């Protein structure tokens, strides 16, 4: 018998099918590798964040502070980092906010915080001996590291300021500037412009910091346990000294616009500590959604809206403002920049976005931004449209 001949078209079809199967297999392998890398990244970031977060349902182990953990080193290092953090943020904002700029200087503060956070999260060499000696279960449990990430970076960046700026652009309520959009719908474009620019640059900053860490690690020394204890004690003492100096300055020097800086230094540690404990106790409650950071950002944004209303709100009938006392205004500014700035964070928010899988990352980011913005609209927007803001 003679075997049937295969036509050229059938042969070509078989080859195309084999090629497609190979492409599908390559795509499946690539996605599997990408998924594995995401899991490794999530596990690494979760252990590197002092607050931690539950990136998968299977990781249900809580990271609560227990009675045996040393509270004072963690608390005082966060206090120390938060005070320097609010000073850096206010300084950067003062230097980079100018007439004619579309965005306020908080964009550069958030960028700087995310670069440092990226360096800290990916940097391993400096802490490697402490981890090898099993003094700490992971990098996130080291008090000085907690002060650097949660205290300093978390306070240099401010989530609430970004949302407030997005509202001011969308509602055309910038202080002393009115843009007079052709119609209200252009406010949506302004909102998107602020959000995309602010968080886009912050995400880029974190990615840059992670890349820089590979270079910086080559030049960092290995810190021994003895040297680390000196660093930890020094940081704790400086934290106490800064608090004492701040209280003395507030009590002795009763005049000057710089009082808003001292009030910010006073309130910032309270905001940072509240954020830390909210994240510590709530981040593991919901899988793939850092509830603690979300709660801190939402609460801080609502409080910032209330404080802004008190500072800028007009009285009914337009006969004056709600708050006119100079010291009261300085206290409100201190609460804005200090407490709300310390309570809300972009740097930790961006780290969590990197640590979640793509779908959950977009869900977490979108819900956080929209819910916080809605809260500001309800508080500031309703008052602005019914009574008015200065």
Curated annotation (Swiss-Prot):
<dbReference type="GO" id="GO:1903425">
    <property type="term" value="F:fluoride transmembrane transporter activity"/>
</dbReference>
<feature type="topological domain" description="Cytoplasmic">
    <location>
        <begin position="1"/>
        <end position="72"/>
    </location>
</feature>
<dbReference type="GO" id="GO:0005886">
    <property type="term" value="C:plasma membrane"/>
</dbReference>
<dbReference type="GO" id="GO:1903424">
    <property type="term" value="P:fluoride transmembrane transport"/>
</dbReference>
<feature type="region of interest" description="Disordered">
    <location>
        <begin position="1"/>
        <end position="22"/>
    </location>
</feature>
<feature type="topological domain" description="Extracellular">
    <location>
        <begin position="94"/>
        <end position="100"/>
    </location>
</feature>
<feature type="transmembrane region" description="Helical">
    <location>
        <begin position="144"/>
        <end position="164"/>
    </location>
</feature>
<feature type="transmembrane region" description="Helical">
    <location>
        <begin position="101"/>
        <end position="121"/>
    </location>
</feature>
<feature type="topological domain" description="Extracellular">
    <location>
        <begin position="251"/>
        <end position="256"/>
    </location>
</feature>
<feature type="topological domain" description="Cytoplasmic">
    <location>
        <begin position="122"/>
        <end position="143"/>
    </location>
</feature>
<dbReference type="InterPro" id="IPR003691">
    <property type="entry name" value="FluC"/>
</dbReference>
<feature type="transmembrane region" description="Helical">
    <location>
        <begin position="369"/>
        <end position="389"/>
    </location>
</feature>
<feature type="topological domain" description="Cytoplasmic">
    <location>
        <begin position="207"/>
        <end position="229"/>
    </location>
</feature>
<feature type="topological domain" description="Extracellular">
    <location>
        <begin position="312"/>
        <end position="338"/>
    </location>
</feature>
<feature type="topological domain" description="Extracellular">
    <location>
        <position position="390"/>
    </location>
</feature>
<comment type="similarity">
    <text>Belongs to the fluoride channel Fluc/FEX (TC 1.A.43) family.</text>
</comment>
<feature type="transmembrane region" description="Helical">
    <location>
        <begin position="339"/>
        <end position="359"/>
    </location>
</feature>
<feature type="transmembrane region" description="Helical">
    <location>
        <begin position="257"/>
        <end position="279"/>
    </location>
</feature>
<feature type="transmembrane region" description="Helical">
    <location>
        <begin position="230"/>
        <end position="250"/>
    </location>
</feature>
<keyword id="KW-0812">Transmembrane</keyword>
<protein>
    <recommendedName>
        <fullName>Fluoride export protein 1</fullName>
    </recommendedName>
</protein>
<comment type="function">
    <text>Fluoride channel required for the rapid expulsion of cytoplasmic fluoride.</text>
</comment>
<feature type="transmembrane region" description="Helical">
    <location>
        <begin position="186"/>
        <end position="206"/>
    </location>
</feature>
<keyword id="KW-1003">Cell membrane</keyword>
<feature type="topological domain" description="Cytoplasmic">
    <location>
        <begin position="360"/>
        <end position="368"/>
    </location>
</feature>
<feature type="transmembrane region" description="Helical">
    <location>
        <begin position="73"/>
        <end position="93"/>
    </location>
</feature>
<keyword id="KW-0472">Membrane</keyword>
<dbReference type="Pfam" id="PF02537">
    <property type="entry name" value="CRCB"/>
</dbReference>
<feature type="topological domain" description="Cytoplasmic">
    <location>
        <begin position="280"/>
        <end position="290"/>
    </location>
</feature>
<feature type="transmembrane region" description="Helical">
    <location>
        <begin position="291"/>
        <end position="311"/>
    </location>
</feature>
<keyword id="KW-1133">Transmembrane helix</keyword>
<feature type="topological domain" description="Extracellular">
    <location>
        <begin position="165"/>
        <end position="185"/>
    </location>
</feature>
């Amino acid at each position: 018998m003679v075997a049937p001949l295969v036509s050229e078209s059938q042969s070509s079809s078989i080859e195309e099918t084999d090629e497609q199967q190979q492409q599908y297999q390559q795509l499946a392998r690539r996605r599997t590798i990408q998924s594995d890398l995401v899991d490794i990244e999530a596990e690494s970031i979760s252990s590197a964040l002092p607050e931690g977060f539950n990136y998968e349902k299977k990781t249900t182990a809580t990271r609560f502070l227990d009675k045996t953990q040393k509270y004072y080193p963690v608390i005082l290092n966060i206090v120390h980092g938060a005070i320097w953090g609010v000073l850096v943020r206010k300084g950067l904002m003062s230097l980079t906010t100018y007439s004619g700029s579309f965005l306020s200087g908080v964009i550069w503060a958030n960028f700087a915080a995310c670069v440092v956070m990226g360096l800290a999260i990916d940097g391993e060499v400096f802490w490697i001996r402490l981890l090898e000696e099993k003094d700490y279960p992971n990098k996130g449990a080291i008090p000085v590291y907690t002060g650097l990430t949660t205290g300093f970076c978390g306070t240099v960046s401010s989530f609430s300021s970004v949302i407030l700026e997005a509202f001011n652009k969308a509602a055309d309520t910038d202080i002393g500037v009115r843009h007079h959009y052709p119609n209200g719908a252009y406010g949506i474009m302004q909102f998107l412009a602020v959000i995309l620019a602010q968080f886009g640059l912050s995400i880029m900053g974190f990615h840059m910091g992670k890349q820089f860490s590979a270079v910086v690690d080559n030049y960092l020394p290995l810190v021994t346990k003895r040297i680390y204890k000196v660093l930890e004690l020094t940081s704790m003492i400086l934290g106490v000294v800064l608090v004492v100096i701040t209280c003395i300055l507030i009590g002795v020097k009763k005049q000057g616009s710089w009082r808003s800086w001292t009030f910010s230094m006073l309130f910032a540690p309270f905001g940072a500590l509240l954020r830390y404990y909210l994240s510590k106790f709530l981040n593991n409650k919901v899988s793939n959604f850092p509830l603690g950071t979300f709660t801190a950002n939402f609460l801080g944004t609502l409080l910032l809206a209330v404080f802004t209303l008190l500072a800028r709100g007009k009285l009914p009938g337009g006969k004056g403002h709600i708050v006119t006392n100079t010291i009261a205004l300085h206290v409100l500014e201190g609460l804005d920049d200090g407490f709300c700035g310390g309570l809300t964070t972009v740097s930790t928010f961006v780290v969590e976005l990197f640590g979640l899988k793509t779908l959950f990352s977009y869900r977490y980011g979108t819900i956080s931004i929209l819910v916080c913005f809605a809260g500001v609209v309800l508080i500031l927007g309703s008052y602005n449209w019914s009574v008015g803001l200065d």
